[in-house]
Regions:
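Extracytosolic helix-loop segments that constitute the early lumenal/periplasmic catalytic or substrate-binding loops
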Residues: 67
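C-terminal catalytic domain of Rieske-type non-heme iron oxygenases
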Residues: 266-267, 400-403
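Short, surface-exposed amphipathic charged segments that create phosphate/polyanion-binding patches used
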Residues: 214
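Flavin (primarily FAD) cofactor-binding/catalytic cores of flavoenzymes
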Residues: 2-57, 70-182, 188-205, 210-211, ...
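Active-site segment of extracytoplasmic enzymes that catalyze sulfate/phosphate-ester chemistry
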Residues: 63-64
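Terminal hydrophobic/aromatic helix or amphipathic segment near a protein terminus
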Residues: 217-229
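Active-site-proximal substrate-binding core of FAD-dependent oxidoreductases
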Residues: 208-211, 373-401
Length: 457
């Protein structure tokens, strides 16, 4: 059996982009997907997905599409989860990737033996590959903290991963813990369905409306940016205060950081619900009693249901953790994809950033594929690349000083990151992905409803 192939674990956007680039370079590969369709978390029917019925993209279609495959013109500025899933399916179809995917195949483990990666699917014989790409996603392992006094609380406490639709909130007093984008979305769902909705936040945040002067916020930032970061932060901060006003009036805390220094909260609805009392802002939780939540400011609320929108832990369950160096629950990878310990092991999608990620995944995938190509056909060049990727990682946050938190450890500024990828590509004299795609002249499909979207939770 020819082992000069690449095993890709995961048929979500990260895995599919790697597959496209490998196919462009005529490098054989096999994708393993534990579910029955492509799309990863965007398929709400997948067990364990954090997706919920009301979810939409938080970056605009204009700034979020794959290179060479823009989102359809008839999509709204912020596509729904159904539209994003259709878009991913069409990406796989147009690029001829379905025939390379083994669906309903969960990987039990992957071991490295005699210079090869032995991929062990559940209920099947192991298969050996020369290269391995981990692209199984970072939103499958819930971070579920225990609340003080939870054992005596008679209400329900659950992680947001189990939340699917707002019917569950009917006639309940609901507290959402966490102000990430999922947390504020869920609080907005609770606003019109629950008896009363609350949201608990540890700190103050900057809320970015999805449209600024009628333009998607990320498009506006792209068109008006380009100056020094300190100036952009100052100007954007002033503008946000003009647009949203003094948020402490609504019970929110004043942010302790500059705008752009934390993951953006892209939401135009929560402030509306706070203004109308449909959602009430609360401080961090101190402890629970039998039927109340006691907050750190001493206030209390009777609550029936607590939703913990407390994020997810990075995990690669099929691979021994020793294959990566981990810091603050993040695998330490050069340019977020190259493993300094083993040049035949790559990862894609294990990063958090402040912009649309699909174009970033495209560029990452192309560099992974070109590195594999060098190992396959240009050993002298491959040796140089391997030595280069073993150096300490560069600062990918750019001029932004991100807040000190586990989530922001190794956080990536999109523009800084794309410049670093371009510099890496040009160092080895590689043609750009854009040029390669232009030569292939790929057809484009409009998103159409597929059978898997008929089942709505």
């Amino acid at each position: 059996m020819d082992t000069n192939k690449v095993a890709i674990i995961g048929a979500g956007p990260a895995g599919l982009t790697v597959a496209r680039s490998l196919k462009l370079l005529n490098i054989p590969f096999q994708i393993y997907e534990k579910h029955s369709e492509v799309g990863g978390i965007w398929d709400i029917t997948n067990a364990g997905t954090p997706m919920y019925q009301s979810a939409h993209f938080i970056s605009s279609k204009t700034m979020s599409g794959h290179l060479g495959f823009p989102m359809p013109d008839d999509y709204p500025d912020y596509p729904s989860r159904i539209q994003i899933h259709q878009y991913i399916q069409n990406f796989a179809q147009v690029n001829g990737l379905y025939e390379h995917i083994r669906f309903n195949t969960k990987i039990k483990e992957v071991v490295f033996k005699d210079g090869l990666w032995q991929v062990q699917p559940e209920g099947a014989a192991p298969v050996s590959y020369r290269w391995l790409v981990c692209a199984s996603g970072s939103l499958w392992d819930p971070n579920r903290p225990r609340l003080k006094g939870e054992e005596q609380f008679e209400g329900e406490v659950m992680h947001a991963v189990k939340y699917k639709n707002s019917d569950y909130f009917r006639n309940k007093r609901v507290l959402v813990v966490g102000a990430g984008n999922s947390g504020v979305d869920i609080a907005c769902d609770a606003a019109f369905m629950a008896q009363q909705a609350f949201i608990s936040m540890r700190r103050g945040y900057h809320f970015v409306p999805k449209h600024i002067f009628g333009i998607p916020a990320d498009v506006f930032a792209h068109k008006t940016g380009g100056g020094p970061m300190w100036l952009s932060q100052w100007v954007f901060g002033k503008m946000l205060r003009l647009l949203t006003g003094n948020l402490t009036r609504l019970g929110l805390q004043k942010p302790d950081h500059s705008v752009m220094s934390s993951h953006p909260i892209m939401n135009s609805q929560l402030l509306h619900y706070l203004q109308h009392g449909d959602v009430i802002a609360k401080r961090d939780i101190d402890h629970l009693t039998k039927n109340e939540v006691v907050f750190k400011d001493g206030s209390t609320e009777e609550v029936d249901l607590i939703i913990l929108a407390t994020g997810y832990k990075y995990s690669i369950p099929y691979l021994d953790k020793a294959f990566f160096e981990w810091k603050s629950n993040r695998p330490q990878l050069y340019l977020k994809m190259f493993n300094p310990q083993n040049p035949t092991l790559f990862a894609s999608g294990y990063l958090e950033t402040n912009g649309g990620i699909y174009g970033m995944l495209d560029q990452m995938a192309y560099l992974i594929a070109k590195s594999v190509e060098a190992q396959l056909h240009q050993p002298a060049l491959a040796k140089q690349i391997i030595a280069h990727t073993q150096q300490p990682p560069a600062n990918l946050g750019g001029a932004i000083k991100f807040v000190s938190s586990d989530r922001h450890t190794g956080y990536v500024d999109k523009d800084t990151y794309l410049k670093a990828l371009k510099k890496f590509r040009k160092k080895w004299g590689w043609e750009s992905l854009e040029s390669v795609l232009a030569r292939t002249n790929q057809p484009k499909l409009s998103a159409t409803k597929t059978a898997s979207e008929e089942a709505i939770v």
